[in-house]
Amino acid sequence: MDSRRRSPTVTAKAAAGELPLAPHEGQNQQPSIPRSSDVLPLPLYLANGVFFTLFFSVMYFLLTRWREKIRNATPLHVVTLSELAALASLIASVIYLVSFFGLDFVQSLIYKPNNEGWEIEEEILMVEDSRNGTNCTTLGCAVPPPSVPKIAPVVPQQPSKMVIIEKPAPLITPQNSEEDEDIIKAVVAGKIPSYSLESKLGDCKRAAGIRREALQRITGKSLEGLPLEGFDYASILGQCCEMPVGYVQLPVGIAGPLLLDGREYMLPMATTEGCLVASTNRGCKAILASGGANSVLLRDGMTRAPVVRFGTAKRAAELKFYMEDTQNFETISVVFNKSSRFAKLQSVQCAIAGKNLYIRFSCSTGDAMGMNMVSKGVQNVLEFLQTDYPDMDVLGISGNFCADKKPAAVNWIEGRGKSVVCEAIIKEEIVKTVLKTEVAALIELNMVKNLAGSAIAGALGGFNAHASNIVSAIFIATGQDPAQNVESSQCITMMEAVNDGKDLHISVTMPSIEVGTVGGGTQLASQSACLNLLGVKGASKDSPGANSRLLATIVAGSVLAGELSLMSAISAGQLVRSHMKYNRSSKDITNIASSQLESDS
């Protein structure tokens, strides 16, 4: 605000000996507007003090005179010389104060800050950091400003064996504008934190490009194969990813149609594993030819379990009894449900370990996956309990009794997210013609592999062939959290003979499918398109939570198809042959190695 003490047009060059961070070409420069305080000969603090004192003094004088005229019935328009002087002083002080303080506020709303308006103090701190830095080469920290070496093409050493990968591409850097080049050098030197580029530049794509180039210069490694163009970086700002330098391309295959609950679905699967989409597609074909699959949603509730500590185990038990008392549930629900109109507390489960109490809250979350929603509700309850339990020490909003992104028996038994069971009856003819195996062989293999074999391995929720394959592929395609594949893939696959032993009954039971159709990565363009393909894009307008529940049943139905096909391939001895045919690189490694040796010699 003080133009004589802190000028927004002072450049970094004057402060740190470097070029200023100029705005991108095409951006307008912020005009330098004079202020009333610049024309006064007094120091700024004296000028402000004089006009503040003058304003309040004449205001007090005029109000006093106004009250006296009212008491004496004197006309208000009759003024004395002193009153005229007071009015003039009031107007002058108002003009000064408004021009000094008011214009700054208006200008901050009208004029967008540019790169030259960055705070001089921040640039001085950056210079100090660069002087004090030692061997730090991280993008977000300060490093000494060494001269940037020229990056030569990366050439691998002469190998001793014939197995050679393709020659890496040389480090090709695009032509940057002069102002971008200055910013890149400042990031490399550690004078500008890489994480602040988006907020400073106001252009997410430009920030990603500058960060990418700085990363290449710091590491000496090329990112030529990592695409930068063709992505909306503003869509991930503050939501999906920090400090982006590009995006990874993943192929998306389509399996189906999957006939589930009387409706057909085409399944988008993002994967780099050959045979996975083809195998799932074969399972869908067998299910479709047998009349389809049916699903049942058993539970729908996201959980969060904070951990609190008391001075004694007795005191912790008192809170446990209070939380699990049904008479107190309504009170707790009212406090919890304030977090969102979609949040509805379902249950509270407590566990004690010494003086520590773990409180597992479960609530419905609409069409969102719901982790943030349930966490907000838990925070509300903890603040409410603090009144009656002031000795309660909240150690963490999550105490791993939830349990999130970890294989846990509590999820396997109690469920987390959506609990779904999906089943189908596969006709004997389809088992023979499409799956190329026998019903009896499938049942025996399922028992010795998925049940007995998993038990011998000590599996926790892993009584299946490859549920994780299908879950992760659909999760990535539809913008779910891939890390929650850990508990979402917990599945037990059951097979038995029906209809006098002729047909096969197959089912998958999945107690912890954690999905959502709003929030997180679901709002990205590619992932949103995949959700739209399934008919579950966004929030359900008719019934909150219907889209996320439908997505969970589709995931379970897809797992059913994948389990059916893989188990059939193993039973028929086709697994190795199919993977050798479809899951190997088509590149001739020997020819690549020979050409590589010739080019290097």
Swiss-Prot record:
This is 3-hydroxy-3-methylglutaryl-coenzyme A reductase. It is found in: Endoplasmic reticulum membrane. Keywords: Endoplasmic reticulum, Glycoprotein, Isoprene biosynthesis, Membrane, NADP, Oxidoreductase, Transmembrane, Transmembrane helix. The lineage of its organism: Eukaryota, Viridiplantae, Streptophyta, Embryophyta, Tracheophyta. Residues 180-601 are annotated as: Catalytic. The chain crosses the membrane at residues 36-58, 86-106. It catalyses: (R)-mevalonate + 2 NADP(+) + CoA = (3S)-3-hydroxy-3-methylglutaryl-CoA + 2 NADPH + 2 H(+). Residues 107-179 are annotated as: Linker. Belongs to the HMG-CoA reductase family. Catalyzes the synthesis of mevalonate. The specific precursor of all isoprenoid compounds present in plants. It comes from Catharanthus roseus. GO terms for molecular function: hydroxymethylglutaryl-CoA reductase (NADPH) activity. GO terms for biological process: coenzyme A metabolic process; isoprenoid biosynthetic process; sterol biosynthetic process.
